[in-house]
Curated annotation (Swiss-Prot):
It comes from the Bacteria. PROSITE patterns: RIBOSOMAL_L34. GO terms for molecular function: structural constituent of ribosome. One of its GO terms (cellular component) is ribosome. Pfam families: Ribosomal_L34 (PF00468). Belongs to the bacterial ribosomal protein bL34 family. InterPro entries: Ribosomal_bL34, Ribosomal_bL34_CS. The keyword Ribonucleoprotein applies. It comes from Desulforudis audaxviator (strain MP104C). This is Large ribosomal subunit protein bL34. The keyword Ribosomal protein applies. Keywords: Ribonucleoprotein, Ribosomal protein. One of its GO terms (biological process) is translation.
Length: 44
C-alpha cells in the first residue's frame, strides 16, 4: 500500500497558493487571519 501523501508542486500551488486564496472571500479571510497571527509564510 502506498503512502497517502505524494507531494506535487503544481497541485500544491493550484490548491493552496496565494492567487487561489485571493480569489474567494473565505480565501482572503485565511490570508487576513494568518497576517494577523503574524505568520511568516501565508500560503503554500
Amino acid at each position: 500500500m502506498k503512502r497517502t501523501y505524494q507531494p506535487k508542486k503544481r497541485k500544491r500551488k493550484r490548491l493552496h497558493g496565494f492567487l487561489i486564496r485571493m480569489r474567494t472571500r473565505s480565501g482572503r479571510n485565511v490570508i487576513r487571519r494568518r497576517r494577523a497571527k503574524g505568520r511568516k509564510v501565508l500560503t503554500a
